[in-house]
């Protein structure tokens, strides 16, 4: 069935408290999607961010980002007083995010809420801790230890803690019991709000497309707690790290620095770690977009310590064996495969065997540096078409920065006009395509330019900061989108029920 959606990170929602959150503005955006004839809300990873603020470099693949906890919602439930957060200066303009200010000020507010909840722990909290015992205790201890070590990477901790010696872990849990409890409560508060928001979206007939990074960060509880799942040496350092080879976009390639999975070791357990990971993602999202799908067919391995990706080499990935194990344990989860970048026959064969929809990016169709065919007339139906992703310029930014030969090709192919706006013409291109699902960036819907770009790969600073202004998603804009969805056969068959916009009533009590 033809459908459409909008890519809008949680962090980019309007907010009076420094960053987008899972409260009233999130529900308003869901209502906008429904009125605009959309069926999907695609987001970026919602895991905690670390240095550099990238959601693709997280302290945990299972935890939620504490910054996304809506403070007004906590106040409604008696966990915060207005004076504890309403007058805080988050040191950012309404259309951007200051992560340094968030780090310095947000956790102090959350500790106020956590202390009130811990004074009277309720059944819902105890149930959450029990149900998430497969990751929560390790995560909470990891974060408490990071606090105790002034944020230092776990590789710099004392040897008994680095190697997770049982006596050292037991002593740490006792010594830092209050901090461990705080980090557990924060995750309870996050998932209470997330589950309420997702339930609200689903009642409005909006499915959530979540994002799963293929790799995890070296400084993460995932590597610290499960070193046997990764390619590490006797000192627990990576032997090689992840990245991408040099290409037309980068002469030195991309050095991501993530540790690589030990696929041989994982195979011996039936890929149990990955099954747990996918099961969790399917429990919090309706659809899971797996980043860098080509890494499952073959992955690029760069010697640890190298400054660029120039001297890496290709290694064989797990192939279909991983997805067969997932299917055996979980059935057929709804997965989108991010199959962009350097593609080879083994990648195409794996995608075909899995049956997952791949991705097509319209901006790539006119980029003379890209050898793939991303023109809409060549799209298969089983794919997701995008104007661009979080790693691309918004359409207006692309026209301002791309080579004129490329932009002229786009104008000719799509018959774009300045009167309508190039961004509307490009969005029409993906909506009119044969792709089952078309997703456009929120920045394109709003007609924004380079200033709203979410991320520029291989750069540090200035990324992940864009926020929409309050009131940007107007009723008139929703009406225009709804008309275009009808025009291109992407309007959902069933509208949301009349009472779906009521304030969520099934949120766990906090």
Regions found by a protein language model. Name each.
Residues 183-216:
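Conserved, well-ordered alpha-helix/loop/beta-strand core segments that scaffold catalytic motifs
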Residues 9, 15, 53-191, 216-439, ...:
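Alpha-amylase-like alpha-glycosidases and glucanotransferases acting on alpha-linked glucans and related
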Residues 34, 194-202, 327, 351-352:
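Surface-exposed amphipathic alpha-helices with a cationic face
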Residues 44, 207-209, 213, 287, ...:
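Outer-envelope exported proteins of Gram-negative bacteria
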Residues 500-510:
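Long, low-complexity, intrinsically disordered segments
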Residues 24-49, 284-285, 430:
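Catalytic domains of carbohydrate-active enzymes, especially glycoside hydrolases
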Residues 1-11, 27:
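N-terminal regions that are enriched for targeting/export leaders
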């Amino acid at each position: 069935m033809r459908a459409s959606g909008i890519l809008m990170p949680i962090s980019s929602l309007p907010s009076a408290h420094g960053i987008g959150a899972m409260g009233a503005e999130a529900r308003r955006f869901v209502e906008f999607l429904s009125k605009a004839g959309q069926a999907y809300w695609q987001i970026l990873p919602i895991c905690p961010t670390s240095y550099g603020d990238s959601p693709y470099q997280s302290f945990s693949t299972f935890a939620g980002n504490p910054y996304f906890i809506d403070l007004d919602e906590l106040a409604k439930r008696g966990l915060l007083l207005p004076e504890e957060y309403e007058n805080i200066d988050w040191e950012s303009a309404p259309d951007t995010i200051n992560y340094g200010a968030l780090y310095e000020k947000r956790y102090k507010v959350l500790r106020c809420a956590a202390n009130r909840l811990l004074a009277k722990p309720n059944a819902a909290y105890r149930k959450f801790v029990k149900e998430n015992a497969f990751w929560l205790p390790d995560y909470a201890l990891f974060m408490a230890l990071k606090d105790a070590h002034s944020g230092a990477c776990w590789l710099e901790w004392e040897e008994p803690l680095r190697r997770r010696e049982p006596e050292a872990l037991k002593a740490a849990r006792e010594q830092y019991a209050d901090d461990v409890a705080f980090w557990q409560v924060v995750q309870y508060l996050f998932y209470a709000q997330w589950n309420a928001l997702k339930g609200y979206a689903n009642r409005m007939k909006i499915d959530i497309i979540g994002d799963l990074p293929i790799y995890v960060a070296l400084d993460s509880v995932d590597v610290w707690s499960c070193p046997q799942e990764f390619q590490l040496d006797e000192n627990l350092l990576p032997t090689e790290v992840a990245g991408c080879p040099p290409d037309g976009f980068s002469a030195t390639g991309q050095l991501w620095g993530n540790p690589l999975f030990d696929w041989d070791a994982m195979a011996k357990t039936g890929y149990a770690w990955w099954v747990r990971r996918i099961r969790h993602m399917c429990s919090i999202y309706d659809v899971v977009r797996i980043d860098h799908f080509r890494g499952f067919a073959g992955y690029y391995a760069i010697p640890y310590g190298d400054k660029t990706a120039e001297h890496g080499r290709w290694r064989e990935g797990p192939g279909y064996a991983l997805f067969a194990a997932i299917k055996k344990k979980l059935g057929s989860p709804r997965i989108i495969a991010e199959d962009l970048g350097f593609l080879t026959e083994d990648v195409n064969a794996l995608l075909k065997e899995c049956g997952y929809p791949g991705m097509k990016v319209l901006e790539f169709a006119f980029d003379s540096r890209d050898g793939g065919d991303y023109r809409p007339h060549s799209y298969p139906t089983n794919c997701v078409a995008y104007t661009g992703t979080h790693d691309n310029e918004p359409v207006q930014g692309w026209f301002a920065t791309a080579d004129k030969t490329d932009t002229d090709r786009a104008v000719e192919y799509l018959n774009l006009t300045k009167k309508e706006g190039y961004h509307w013409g490009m969005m029409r291109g993906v909506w009119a395509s044969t792709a089952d699902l078309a997703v456009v960036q929120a920045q394109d819907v709003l007609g924004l330019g380079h200033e709203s770009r979410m991320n520029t790969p291989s750069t540090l600073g200035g990324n992940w900061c864009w926020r929409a202004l309050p009131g940007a998603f107007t009723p008139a804009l929703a009406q225009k989108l709804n008309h275009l969805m009808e025009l291109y056969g992407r309007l959902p068959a069933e509208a949301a029920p009349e009472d779906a916009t009521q304030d969520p009533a099934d949120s766990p009590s906090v």
